[in-house]
Amino acid sequence: MSMPSVHVSNYGCSANLAEAEAIKGVLVKEKRYSLAEQEDADVLVLNLCTVKGDHQSLRAVRQAREKNPNAKIVVTGCVTRTLREQVQKQYPDVNITNTNNLHLIQETVAKTLDGESVIHIAGAKEQKANLPRIRTNPVISIIPISTGCLSTCSYCSTKQVKGILKSYPLTTIKKEFDESLREGCKEFWLTSQDNGCWGYDIGMNPAVLLKELSHYRGDDEEQKDYRIRYGMTSPQHFLKDKEAVLEAFHNERVYKFLHLPVQSGSDNVLKGMKRDYTAEEYEQLVQDIKKEHPTMTIATDIIVGYPSESDDDFEQTIGIIKNTHPHISNISRFARREGTTSAQL
């Protein structure tokens, strides 16, 4: 009898990609399942992202069904309550778990193959470092450093799924880093919902992590050639640790890249979004970064169409883009998410 086959599709950020790699690693570790292309697999696992709304996730389910009508489907990832309800209504035979239940993925797939109904939404936070992984790129190690965040952004539904910050211990992160280095990885992506607050709940900060990982401790000359990519950080946290983090970026092993989402150039909108900084503070932060590291690449995120945004607010956002000259601008239209405070506006 042939081994049941699974295909894992990923949508969204690098944190989601790390989880998709872990899902594949966990599923094949005990040799109970094999991996297959989407059109050939017995089970399709869809690791979804709902940061911009549920419609893209529902489209992913529909397209998966169209591509492989005979496969059973498991939905996981950042599954909000509204997405769960819509999937149950439109696709009642699709099983559902979420990002907090990665440890149950083998059980979920097994029950799915047996025709059982599975809904795993509740769940305590689990540590997602040091899990078996099947990497998308064999030389890139995506290392989750925490889950959840400390922000209360009015438009964000991810907080409903991920919850409050839980930093992974430095020793745990170092263990995965060292193992990945021995396995031949040359590039390390540090990922989470917000790298900027890593360590705040365990008496540390991101500068400690960057300095520890960028100072190689071994004797293998080949393993000394690696780079670290520091993921997204909220400006209010970067402001707290600015000097120490910028000092860590002087190590040649740390990519000169920062993802600092501004979201709006209007203080009125930023206040409504519950972003804990002003437009002036953001502009000064970017100036300080460029002064310390002239070659730094800066990416930012912008939300347009926030419910309280006026024409003048919009012009102020254009102004902050002109003043800070980000190398990368990710622009999104405001999406009303049920359960968020901005949904009431």
Region roles according to the model:
Residues M1-C197, K211, L258, E280-K291, ...:
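Proteins enriched for Cys/Gly/acidic motifs involved in redox and nucleic-acid/cofactor modification
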Residues V45, L170, M204-N205, V245, ...:
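Short low-complexity, flexible loop/linker segments enriched in glycine and/or proline
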Residues I73-V74, T82, R182-D311:
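Conserved SAM/AdoMet-binding glycine-rich loop
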Residues I121, L270-M273, S342-L345:
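Short clusters of hydrophobic/aromatic residues that line enzyme substrate/ligand-binding pockets
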Residues K242-E243, H325-P326, T341-Q344:
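Conserved N-terminal phosphate-binding loop of PLP-dependent enzymes in the Aspartate aminotransferase
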